[in-house]
Structures are given as C-alpha cells and as structure tokens.
C-alpha cells in the first residue's frame, strides 16, 4: 500500500451565480462539517443551500430508543446548528417523515438538487431508493457520497464472490487487496458558503429549531448530567486527546484493564463515529499519519485500525441482509433453540441478577449510555450462552434502547458473534461473572460506584455477597435476598450445562456439513491479558476447568488467532446456518445455596 498523507483533500470553491442550483443537504448520520463530501456537493455551483434534518416527533414518542441517545442526538444537532451559524447559515429541523416532507420542500423552496451521505444499511437503502425516485419525478438532481464507511462495501462483497465475508480474518485478507480508503475532504467553510446562503426567517427557531427532550415527550426530572456531550466540536477535541497517546499509537499497546478502564473516558469516540460527528476517514488517516511520524515512515499494520475495521466488518456483513438483527430468515445465523424467559431477561436488563459485576455494568449502561467493550462481552455472554440462555435478539433490543453507539449493523453483529450464533466464535470461551470482575477491579470500587447498596461490603465479598456471613451483611446494611437479590442462577452449574448445549449444537452442524468442527477448537494456551474464566475455582460464581483454557476473543485482542474455518462462505454456509437444531433440555433452576 502506498503511503497516504493525513492532509484533507482540497475541494475547489466554484463560482456561484444567481442561476445556480437550489440545494438541500439532508443530514442523517454524518452530523458534521468536516469530511462531508455530500455537503460539499450541495454547495458546489449553488445559489442557495439549506441544511435539513428530518425528525419524526411521533417516532420519538413511540420509539424504544432511550433518553440518553436522544439527548446525544439533540446535542449533536445543536452543535451542528451553532457551526452553521458561523457560516451565516442554519440547520432546518423539519418535523415529519421523509416521504411526506420532501414533496413539500421541493415545491416550497424550489429545490433543484438534493444531496445526502450514502447509507449502507438495508433500511436506509430502501428509504433512500424511495426518496430518489420521488426526487427524479420532481426533476430534482440527487447526489450521494459515501463517507460513513472507509471502504466501498459492495466492492468487498464483489471480491468475495458476491457474498459478504463472515470471518474477520477473511475480511482483513480482502481489504488488504484493496486500495487505501479515500482521504477525508476539507471542512465546509465560509468561503464555500458565502454565495449560497439560504434566507433565514426571524421565526426560524419556532419553525425549524432543534427541539428539547421535553418537547419530544421525554420526562427529564431526575435525569443526570450527560457523561457524553454530543456534537462534532466535542468529537474533534476527543480525537486530539485520543491521539496524544503516542506510545500507544507506536506500539499498539493496550493498557491493562483496571477499575478506571471501566469508566467513560474523555478520549472515547464510539458514539461520535456512530452519529457521524467524527469522520471514520479522518480518524483513520490521523492514526496513519501519527504512526508514520513516530515510526519513521513505516507502514502501519491493519491491527492499528481495529476499532474501525471491526465496525467495517459488521457493516459489510449487514448491508444486503435486512434480517441481520433477528434469527428468523437470517441466512448467516445459526438457529439455536434459546429459552423464552422474560423474567430473567427483565432482571438482566434492570441490573437485578444478583451478580454485582453484571448488575453494575447494566446500571452504568442505563445511567450513562455506554459501557466498556469487555463489559459488553461479559453481559452478552451472561444473557446468552453463558448463563441465562436467552436469545441474542433480546440483547440487541436492550442495547438499541440504552447504548449511545448502537446501530443496526454493529449492534446485531456483535450480539451474534458473542452468542456464538455467527462469525465462528469459540463457544468454550465463557466470562465468569465473579472472577472476571474481581481480576479487573479487586477492590470492587466499580461496583460500589454503580451499586451503592453494596458499598458496605468488604472487597472480599463484594463480588459474591451471598457468601458473606450474616454478620457481614448486617454490618453492610444489606441483607442478600432482602436488600439485594440472590443470584438468578448458579453460574458453575448453568455454564457447564450451556457449554454442553453448544457442544451438541455444533456437533449436529458438523454432521450436517460432513466435516468435523472440532479441528477449529483451540488446543493451545494463549496468554490472556484479561481474565475470562477462573479455572479450578470452587466459588459459586465461577466455572471449573473442564478443558484447555480458551483463547481470548474479539476486538479486544488484536493478536487473536481465528483458527475456525476461513474459506469464503458460500451456499453451503447458508444451508448450514438454517439447520434446525434439536431442542436441548431446559436448564435446571439454581440451587438454594447459589
């Protein structure tokens, strides 16, 4: 690969006259002025440009999306409006649905050009096709530009025989054969906008202003301050802080997990990438440029861009699969016979499982809208194949409600992967809801922060308070079973049962395929940076060592060896994924002393 500079591509400012285009730029995910080629296309040769965001108040009132994500979105829109004001323009927030709004705007504003960022997700493609048809019938030119992903996803699929790659290793092999991602374009400036200003009415805020949470029907009483401030301005500040860690960029050394790792970081970027407040291409090339500067012009490895590439991998897998977020009709998803257990699901979602590590994570998620990626792994494993044996589809819905950075592709893809429903995850890997947290934060400060009921427990018992003597519970002013729930399951028993369930499922899949999947089960021991299980422990919250220690998994480990089948997926894989697996016996209820 040839080296690429981080300098944004220069976009010439074309002369604009009175007979130029009347443009509307439709903001959706790309809520920024930097690296926004579709917005630049709206400006080019135009006499008037209006920047529009369409918000459906009915959707806001009826949507399952939680208040933290709505707050982040509204903050991002406010920030965008503030930036546009500096260019003598404004953001037009239009109420309604696109199919109803655009015919009126086309006529009322005399629109001749509509621009927007390409949306790779199935729902977005369907919506945009309808709008493009409508615009064509109205004589409106439509310009779309790709800037939400690094690569052309259709090109990746084409290189893979017209099918999406279903392992990360295969995905990496494909993109290594492609050209580098396009460089980011420069930000829209006052020079771009000086001759194409839209008329702003005095009552703009009343008609087109960004609404408040209260106006959208959200109760804000008791709502704490935002841990994550939405908007492009904040995103760029965070990017600078993120890249100040030169040693990390040079060596790609991940800091060891500790209690502080679990808290929201001022350098975190995932919600900003999800809403497009930060360009993934700008992030990519800023990383690239800094690595080459520190490493004296060495070409950076793909592993440096792991956060971005895993995102890209899931976008590629989802782009042509409208059933990507569910089991039924999803050709890549193994049809595992999960249990229906609404009571257990509710306790998990509300942070009332009786396992302080799991409950603290879910409480942080509900309060702040974010949790560390390894915390996501822990609660996803607990809900699905680890303990509760509840479908990953339920986890997708809860995360979609609560998680700031949740989107269709990455959220559903991560849940399928972590539940061993797709992407060749190793099912022997199981997170211990006691040992993992204890190894990460031995003092238990994270639990005390989010579960103040347990703050009086000594560190010895805070991860398994059910084992604390009655005198310790009384001293902590928290009686287990009264003030804090008993464990919902006996982890040691249920996790062993669930591993057997998965083992039988994969054996059936192997027989159907005519091959044995056991060749892909790791037989070596990899040094783990982060604890997964506690082999040999006799505690109620741990799993015994029944075999070789599992490999670390997922985006957390750039050195992970994906030793599962790596051939390009074909029709055989689709057939295998649709096999109906024999129903396994329901898990036994937890023992009274669990």
From Swiss-Prot:
Location(s) in or outside the cell: Cytoplasm; Nucleus
Cofactor binding note: Binds 1 FAD per subunit. Only a minority of the protein molecules contain bound FAD. Contrary to the situation in photolyases, the FAD is bound in a shallow, surface-exposed pocket.
Cofactor: FAD; (6R)-5,10-methylene-5,6,7,8-tetrahydrofolate
Positions where Phosphoserine occurs in the chain: 89, 265, 298, 553, 557
Tissue: Expressed in all tissues examined including heart, cerebellum, cerebral cortex, lung, liver, muscle, kidney and ovary. Highest levels in heart, liver and ovary. Highly expressed in the suprachiasmatic nucleus (SCN).
One cellular component term from this protein's GO annotations in UniProt: cytoplasm
Keyword Transcription: yes
Swiss-Prot/TrEMBL keywords: Biological rhythms, Chromophore, Cytoplasm, FAD, Flavoprotein, Isopeptide bond, Nucleotide-binding, Nucleus, Phosphoprotein, Photoreceptor protein, Receptor, Repressor, Sensory transduction, Transcription, Transcription regulation, Ubl conjugation
MF GO annotations: damaged DNA binding; DNA binding; FAD binding; kinase binding; nuclear receptor binding; phosphatase binding; photoreceptor activity; protein kinase binding
Post-translational modification: Phosphorylation on Ser-265 by MAPK is important for the inhibition of CLOCK-BMAL1-mediated transcriptional activity. Phosphorylation by CSKNe requires interaction with PER1 or PER2. Phosphorylated in a circadian manner at Ser-553 and Ser-557 in the suprachiasmatic nucleus (SCN) and liver. Phosphorylation at Ser-557 by DYRK1A promotes subsequent phosphorylation at Ser-553 by GSK3-beta: the two-step phosphorylation at the neighboring Ser residues leads to its proteasomal degradation.
One GO term (biological process): negative regulation of DNA-templated transcription
Biased amino acid composition, Polar residues: 536-547
Gene3D superfamilies assigned to the protein according to its UniProt record, in alphabetical order: 1.25.40.80, DNA Cyclobutane Dipyrimidine Photolyase, subunit A, domain 3 (1.10.579.10), HUPs (3.40.50.620)
Location of the region described as Disordered in the Swiss-Prot/TrEMBL record: 532-594
Entry similarity comment: Belongs to the DNA photolyase class-1 family.
Subunit structure comment from the entry: Component of the circadian core oscillator, which includes the CRY proteins, CLOCK or NPAS2, BMAL1 or BMAL2, CSNK1D and/or CSNK1E, TIMELESS, and the PER proteins. Interacts with TIMELESS. Interacts directly with PER1, PER2 and PER3; interaction with PER2 inhibits its ubiquitination and vice versa. Interacts with CLOCK-BMAL1. Interacts with CLOCK. Interacts with BMAL1. Interacts with NFIL3. Interacts with FBXL3 and FBXL21. FBXL3, PER2 and the cofactor FAD compete for overlapping binding sites. FBXL3 cannot bind CRY2 that interacts already with PER2 or that contains bound FAD.
Biological function: Transcriptional repressor which forms a core component of the circadian clock. The circadian clock, an internal time-keeping system, regulates various physiological processes through the generation of approximately 24 hour circadian rhythms in gene expression, which are translated into rhythms in metabolism and behavior. It is derived from the Latin roots 'circa' (about) and 'diem' (day) and acts as an important regulator of a wide array of physiological functions including metabolism, sleep, body temperature, blood pressure, endocrine, immune, cardiovascular, and renal function.
Descriptive protein name: Cryptochrome-2
Lineage, uppermost ranks: Eukaryota, Metazoa, Chordata, Craniata, Vertebrata
